[in-house]
């Protein structure tokens, strides 16, 4: 009986240890366009969130830049007033260089990486994560980068204004 308990305890420790190894830093994703182009290394960065109510209260505040990171067609179909599109569809599929290029184009002025940036995607997950990672590569002040909780879906469900 003691041998079984000891063996079971040992297996639990091994299983927990193996599980903890998987909880470390997220792996880097590297993408290259091939040829002599330099690879773009993108590390997964932790996201911070803003509620729909807080964004609504600050929508007219010039300190905030709202970047809608959904597909361009979905942005055109309806977006938060004043938002700028930075399509992250290619980055979501592993093309980090395109994601970074789209983010640069949406920002326009490189100094905008220091202002408060709110990322809007479909549900506040994959596209927003790609955008957060791209902003980190561009040197954004990550203390000022927020993802809209629940994404555009939550904004729509709250009944807030949308423009086309």
Give the role of each language-model region:
Residues 2-10, 15-61, 75-118, 122-164:
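Rhodanese-like catalytic fold shared by cysteine-dependent sulfurtransferases
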Residues 65-70, 86:
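Short hydrophobic beta-strand that contains or immediately precedes a catalytic carboxylate
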